[in-house]
Amino acid sequence: MGQKVNPHGFRLGITSEFTSRWYADKQYKAYVGEDVKIRKMMSRGMERAGISRVDIERTQGRLRVDIHTARPGIVIGRRGAEADRIRGDLEKLTGKQVQLNILEVKNPEVDAQLVAQGVAEQLSSRVSFRRAMRKAMQTAMKGGAKGIRVQCSGRLGGAEMSRSEFYREGRVPLHTLRADIDYGFYEARTNFGRIGVKVWIYKGDIVQSRAEREAQEALQRQTRRDRPRRGPRSGSSGTTQGGTDAGRAAARSERRGRGGNAPAAETAASEAGATESTAPESTAPESTAPESTAPESTAPESTAPETTAPEAASSPAPAAESTAPATAASESAATPAAAATPGTPEKAEE
């Protein structure tokens, strides 16, 4: 399929772009006809200008035409007279305001359309077709092309029967979609009839190899990591710190700080608890001594002057009075036991 189809249409969106950029729903037919007429007008009176291609772009009520040429001086004319004439003809044809841009082709030796046009001009001036084809191939290979194929079809050399001949040099991979292949076609008008000239020029692969692509992706990832991060943003309400990046970072650092100081705090608390627990055990006998002298502390409670106050009618006062006899009774019960304990040796002696 790649041997038959036009390389530009076969690679649209991959290595080649559309030469007409516009969108129309109901006027599609009219716009296509206008584009064909514009390109015919450019090629009819500009044979010596070396026009490579014409790009057409439409906007609402406006038309932009980009002319790519190897000889911009011929298209512009003296003091821009030729450019003004072309602009006027385009405005008459389309009825819209036209913006005309004339662009120069930097390397015409590798442009397929210009190479085909050069071969056709030589055939029109009765140059041998083999000589013209080989000269074009040598010039293109010196200009940086990786491969070229030139084909001529018609009554070659004035023969009665038409035939096709082609010459090729280098690589021309027509089936490879990633290959950047330029294609050009031009017709030479001779005394014996028309001779068609087709040129394919291979300029290299546009899509990179897998290793190069992986290296480029790795470099892009590295640049993304090194890219400076933007500052913290405020939360949804603008006042909450927990929803911001700074608040999260602060909370995270606090948690880490607590986790690091927790063992020290636990050891300090355990040591303090150990000292407190040992202190009462050592002073246990001393603590029992004041319990024996409890009547001295209860004496003022029984004679509390608060009972004579008007507030003595409240419920807490009788409770205090009732507790005082209970403590006294317990103390009185304890004292006989204490008195009886020293008497036990006397019974033993008897």
Swiss-Prot record:
Pfam entry (one): Ribosomal_S3_C
UniProt region (Disordered), positions on chain: 211-350
Domain (KH type-2): residue spans on this chain: 38-106
Positions of disulphide bridges: none
Transmembrane regions: none
Gene Ontology cellular component list: cytosolic small ribosomal subunit
Domain of life according to the entry: Bacteria
Molecular function in Gene Ontology: mRNA binding; rRNA binding; structural constituent of ribosome
CDD domains with a match to the protein in the record: KH-II_30S_S3
Biased composition (Basic residues): 222-232
Example GO biological process: translation
Compositionally biased residues, Low complexity: 261-350
SUPFAM superfamilies assigned to the protein according to its UniProt record, in alphabetical order: Prokaryotic type KH domain (KH-domain type II), Ribosomal protein S3 C-terminal domain
InterPro entries per UniProt: KH_dom, KH_dom-like_a/b, KH_dom_type_2, KH_sf_prok-type, Ribosomal_S3_C_sf, Ribosomal_uS3_bac-typ, Ribosomal_uS3_C, Ribosomal_uS3_CS
Keywords, in A-Z order: Ribonucleoprotein, Ribosomal protein, RNA-binding, rRNA-binding
HAMAP family attached to this UniProt entry: Ribosomal_uS3_B (MF_01309_B)
UniProt family annotation: Belongs to the universal ribosomal protein uS3 family.
Function: Binds the lower part of the 30S subunit head. Binds mRNA in the 70S ribosome, positioning it for translation.
Description of how the protein assembles with itself and partners: Part of the 30S ribosomal subunit. Forms a tight complex with proteins S10 and S14.
Protein name: Small ribosomal subunit protein uS3
Organism taxonomic ancestry: Bacteria, Bacillati, Actinomycetota, Actinomycetes, Frankiales
